[in-house]
Amino acid sequence: MATLCRPSVSVPEHVITMEETLELARRRHTDHPQLPLALRLIENTGVRTRHIVQPIEDTLEHPGFEDRNKVYEREAKSRVPAVIQRALDDAELLATDIDVIIYVSCTGFMMPSLTAWLINEMGFDSTTRQIPIAQLGCAAGGAAINRAHDFCTAYPEANALIVACEFCSLCYQPTDLGVGSLLCNGLFGDGIAAAVVRGRGGTGVRLERNGSYLIPKTEDWIMYDVKATGFHFLLDKRVPATMEPLAPALKELAGEHGWDASDLDFYIVHAGGPRILDDLSTFLEVDPHAFRFSRATLTEYGNIASAVVLDALRRLFDEGGVEEGARGLLAGFGPGITAEMSLGCWQTADVRRGIRQDVTRTAARGVSRRVRQA
């Protein structure tokens, strides 16, 4: 059964604190009639620090969509490979053991996808399948886990690599002056995450069931307005309240699996903002402490879009994981309004060691190639 292994995460070296964000807002929007409200909303996010791919002075300039997209491509090619290599090492696999790369990003555009460059540069087999996902926003982290689960269910000997690369700072638009835009300027950060889903063996979350749910008639609540200047992010004021209609979908998925969503051992969810976590605690009737990993990501990195779920899971690993067989929920939330949800149990490599030792890497690569040719 497919196992989601320890994620590798990297954030850029340029850091901006909440205090610096608030001061920038005061300086750049002195005469804005709703500045006090915007400042209060930014403070309420709880985001203490964010990491960005360029110095703040460069981020605040807008050289044009073309130049920004060049920065996206340059920084992705510079930073992603090391994150992938650590994820492969943590999963005890080689690049040639990977059968599919699922690449998610909503903050830049490349064609061919970065996956083609990665296959050429990092030694993945030329038959490696590519699944780039560009338009699911913050929900894409959960979607990538689910698509990897689906692939490994269809091909039980296969291994999937998930990569999330988000440079939200490249979407900053100095002419967007609505309160929602000012809030986003203090909420989003940049980050890269990668994780392997092994078809056999591995330590991590043994994925058992996944599902998706879209709240009807909410597709304009989170969206891009694409202009000559790039991606203009639009965030409706109703978004923070979306956990009330989404919580029943989480409960239903757990119920279909014979579980109670209010009585699980770990919760790894997208932290788009503090109210999402607070409301999930309320509507799922779960202790707020259960969402500590997601809240830590929000506090230290901000909303890093599709990479949030993987970073929160990384923090669970860093805490030492959980006991064998512990049951958990993973979920990403984003445009649509969409929830991508999965359920799984914790397993350690020792439990399935017999399986892993029966398949050498040479034999596994042979199986992998047969899967690709199927």
Swiss-Prot record:
**Ranges that cross the membrane:** none
Keyword match Acyltransferase? yes
GO BP terms, alphabetized: melanin biosynthetic process; polyketide biosynthetic process
| InterPro entries hit by this protein | Chalcone/stilbene_synt_C (IPR012328), Chalcone/stilbene_synt_N (IPR001099), Polyketide_synthase_type-III (IPR011141), Thiolase-like (IPR016039)
Q: Which Pfam families match?
A: Chal_sti_synt_C, Chal_sti_synt_N
The reply to whether Acyltransferase figures as a keyword in the UniProt entry is yes
Q: Which PANTHER family match?
A: 1,3,6,8-TETRAHYDROXYNAPHTHALENE SYNTHASE, HYDROXYMETHYLGLUTARYL-COA SYNTHASE
Q: What is this protein called?
A: 1,3,6,8-tetrahydroxynaphthalene synthase
Task: Tell me the organism.
Answer: Streptomyces coelicolor (strain ATCC BAA-471 / A3(2) / M145)
Output the lineage of the source organism: Bacteria, Bacillati, Actinomycetota, Actinomycetes, Kitasatosporales
